[in-house]
């Protein structure tokens, strides 16, 4: 709903569509089956987005990628699942490399898809309990760590496109060995796997416990937001960030947040790299020498600041926002 509202406020939001909570309830009432006409509706929505962005889902030359996220009525931080980069396959990878001229970025995006998909769709949604408490994501991270050690790399940034390709291949072998399922190479299989996994996450253990604690009714269900991917990691002029429309600790009217150059959304919150301050006024002694978004991309920062004002006026409350900058173009992902 917030994404749709931002669109109505003429705030730049990547195009997408929502599968409603009614479908979630139908799914649980119908023995985990989706309504018969849903695939026609989804395909029509995909076509509309393809027309807006002039890209095609599953296309070998100019592929469109999607994220699948939950859209619960009440925010349930970290409880519900997300899968990014859906649509990367052996057929679309070469096209995206040709399009972006960035082999490293594409293979990095692909290994992220594999990690998230294995964790969210193949393991958690299927209700598989990890052996020795080590889930598939943990195992894949161990594979990556040992690969870096072998190569003498200290950070993810050190890996080349070929490195990420090798790591992805190792990931797929481990997934097959551990979970007895192939990582799907068809974009539609990936998409529907992601959609069903979000619905299933509504009844995951963590989500149920959280609802009990917060008094959120089970029958609300979750919606699924399917949204075109925009990338904060295609170039130096790309970035990703999170912000509060004012200081969350004091409520002071200061635009407050963090951003990472040439990074994808989850990097900011994952703690893998140290984010930079959003602007000059909120710098502290510890980050006073770091590059702020305000000084690096002043036009984009100005636009972001205008969005912040619009959102506060509209919602009459402090907002917590996520944004991505793709090749110098601002996109709002969440408020």
Features from the language model and the residues they span:
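Nucleotide/phosphate-binding sheet-loop regions of phosphoryl- and nucleotidyl-transfer enzymes
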Residues: 1-335
């Amino acid at each position: 709903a917030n994404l749709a509202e931002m669109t109505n406020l003429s705030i730049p939001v990547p195009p997408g569509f929502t599968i409603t909570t009614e479908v979630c309830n139908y799914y649980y009432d119908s023995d985990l089956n989706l309504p018969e006409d849903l695939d026609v509706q989804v395909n029509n929505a995909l076509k509309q987005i393809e027309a807006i962005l002039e890209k095609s889902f599953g296309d070998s030359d100019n592929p469109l990628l999607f994220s699948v996220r939950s859209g619960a009525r009440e925010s349930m931080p970290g409880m519900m699942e997300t899968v990014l980069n859906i649509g990367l396959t052996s057929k679309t990878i070469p096209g995206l490399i040709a399009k972006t001229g960035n082999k490293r970025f594409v293979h990095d995006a692909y290994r992220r898809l594999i990690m998230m998909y294995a964790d969210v769709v193949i393991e958690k949604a299927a209700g598989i309990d990890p052996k020795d408490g080590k889930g598939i994501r943990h195992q894949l991270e161990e594979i990556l760590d040992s690969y870096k050690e072998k190569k003498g790399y200290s950070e993810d940034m050190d890996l080349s496109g070929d490195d990420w390709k090798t790591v992805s291949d190792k990931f797929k072998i481990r997934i097959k060995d551990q979970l007895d399922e192939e990582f799907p190479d068809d974009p539609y299989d990936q998409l529907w796997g992601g959609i069903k996994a979000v619905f299933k996450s509504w009844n995951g253990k963590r989500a149920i416990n959280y609802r009990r604690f917060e008094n959120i009714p089970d029958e609300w269900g979750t919606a699924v937001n399917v949204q075109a991917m925009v990338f904060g990691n295609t170039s130096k002029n790309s970035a990703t960030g999170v912000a509060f429309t004012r200081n969350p600790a004091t409520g002071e009217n200061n635009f407050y947040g963090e951003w990472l150059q040439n990074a994808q959304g989850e990097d900011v919150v994952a703690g893998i790299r140290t984010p930079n301050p959003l602007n000059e006024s909120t710098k502290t002694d510890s980050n006073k020498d770091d590059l702020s978004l305000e000084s690096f991309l002043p036009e984009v920062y100005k636009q972001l600041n205008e969005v912040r004002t619009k959102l506060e006026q509209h919602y009459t409350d402090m907002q917590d926002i996520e944004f991505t900058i793709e090749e110098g173009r601002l996109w709002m992902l969440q408020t």
